[in-house]
Amino acid sequence: MGYYSLTEVTAVQYAKEHGYFEKKANVVCHEIGDGNLNYVFKLDDGEKSIIIKQALPYAKVVGESWPLSIKRATIESKALQIFAKYVPEYVPVVYSHDEELAVTVIEDLSRLTITRKGLIDGEEYPLLSQHIGRFLANVLFYTSDFGLQSEEKRVLEGTFVNPDLCKITEDLVFTDPFGHYDTNDYEPELQLTIDELWSDKTLKLKVAQYKYKFLTRKEALIHGDLHTGSIFSSPSETKVIDPEFATYGPFGFDIGQFIANLLLNALSREEEQRGVLFFHIEKTWSYFVETFTKLWIGEGVEAYTKEKQWLPIILQNIFTDAVGFAGCELIRRTIGLAHVADLDEITNKETRIQAKKQALSLGKELIKYESKNADIQLFRTLFQQTVSGGIKA
């Protein structure tokens, strides 16, 4: 019968028809999605629960005037299955995928908390950086030319051509926040700071280079939208979700996005509460390097992985890219179309504006920084130089 949008009623019907619940089961269903592109339903009969996610043929945040291909749901499902091949402990189980309806049935992770919400609430996740560092190292290594034979990599790359969502990234991360575009969204009090940002030709030249890297460097399979709202956490578990932006791209992209979102949370905190965020930023990189290095030495299939001087160059390039991509993410999450609650939910207006100005300044510094070595202390140093004192709630 072709594609149709599910409702809470038809989601239950779908689940029963596909054997997830008995026909007579009393299934409670709620639409729980808070994202911009999908419906997400939680179904529970008191004994078991599942999540049904359906891609919409348009962006919810804009409406039907912004059409999107529902094929992204297939890309998301395939990405989760690729991730599970290498790091099953860090992703939800995919039970099934229906390409015609753009429906994926996945494990219910209600026992966990969306990491962004948890961090805003002051929750601590001691294993977050270890898990994300290892997740990134495994996925990026094993889907790159270093972990896959070149012909296998080319075939896999072809299955993750994702034009609609890549175009969103190109526009909303690298283009629109750096000029006069209707998609931008910001308080009038930021206008002078933004005018200065938009007139900075050196900054724009650097952003152009990072955008070009995103467009042309097909180094590994990236999640494409790895912010703290795309991660479920508890003190002992971490699960990466929502890879519908997955595509082949630069090694450093996901790392930069994740770090940027930790920095955004740090900006919302008082000075004495920021240490845990810098701990996670620095540990994410150290666990990434440790794991990537072990894989390089033990699992490398490309001939030049045997050259000892090649790995440090690769890691330096990844770090340099991560720094710049983090800067772009900071700016776009502050004045672009899709904001973050870390800043927007600061209740005091003066404090909120201050934090957003600091986010813009820090983003600019990260984009323009010329890193000579992979010094993970850089994020802490530039943060301290850019942000004087603490945020007062």
Swiss-Prot record:
Coiled coil spans: none
Pathway connected to this protein: Amino-acid biosynthesis; L-methionine biosynthesis via salvage pathway; S-methyl-5-thio-alpha-D-ribose 1-phosphate from S-methyl-5'-thioadenosine (hydrolase route): step 2/2
Key words, A-Z: Amino-acid biosynthesis, ATP-binding, Kinase, Methionine biosynthesis, Nucleotide-binding, Transferase
Molecular function per GO: ATP binding; S-methyl-5-thioribose kinase activity
Positions bound to ATP: N38, K53, E107, D108, L109, D242, P243, E244
Pfam families according to UniProt: APH
GO biological process: L-methionine salvage from methylthioadenosine
InterPro entries assigned: Aminoglycoside_PTrfase (IPR002575), Kinase-like_dom_sf (IPR011009), Methylthioribose_kinase (IPR009212)
Catalytic function, reaction form: 5-(methylsulfanyl)-D-ribose + ATP = 5-(methylsulfanyl)-alpha-D-ribose 1-phosphate + ADP + H(+)
Residues involved in substrate binding: D225, R332
UniProt-listed Enzyme Commission number(s): 2.7.1.100
KW Magnesium (keyword) present: no
Keyword check for Phosphoprotein: no
Protein's job: Catalyzes the phosphorylation of methylthioribose into methylthioribose-1-phosphate.
HAMAP family in UniProt: Salvage_MtnK (MF_01683)
Subunit record text: Homodimer.
Family statement drawn from the similarity comment of this UniProt entry: Belongs to the methylthioribose kinase family.
Protein name per UniProt: Methylthioribose kinase
